[in-house]
């Protein structure tokens, strides 16, 4: 019989608490972050219509890390490219949803990259 992972359950509780308070609108959509052990994913969501407006990840075919290496550098690059795509789609302001993760490491790096790219949150 499989045991439930306590970290996963605690993160699910954090996500539900955060989602009660945060909701993206068409004027200010929600920037959602998900990370796995190897990759990081970010998307900008309009919760009113239930649609994903812009997305970027390290799995994306257009993702190129270049000379840099490491997961935090990749997260920062994802943030910069996501911000470029968002400004092309006419999105300037977002609400940051860290997805139950602590604001440290790859999550922080992604948000800093998005800010450098021109997003305001």
Swiss-Prot record:
Gene3D superfamilies: 3.30.420.100
The protein, known as: Large ribosomal subunit protein uL18
Alphabetical UniProt keywords: Ribonucleoprotein, Ribosomal protein, RNA-binding, rRNA-binding
BP terms from Gene Ontology: translation
Gene Ontology molecular-function annotations: 5S rRNA binding; structural constituent of ribosome
Function: This is one of the proteins that bind and probably mediate the attachment of the 5S RNA into the large ribosomal subunit, where it forms part of the central protuberance.
Oligomeric form and interacting partners: Part of the 50S ribosomal subunit; part of the 5S rRNA/L5/L18/L25 subcomplex. Contacts the 5S and 23S rRNAs.
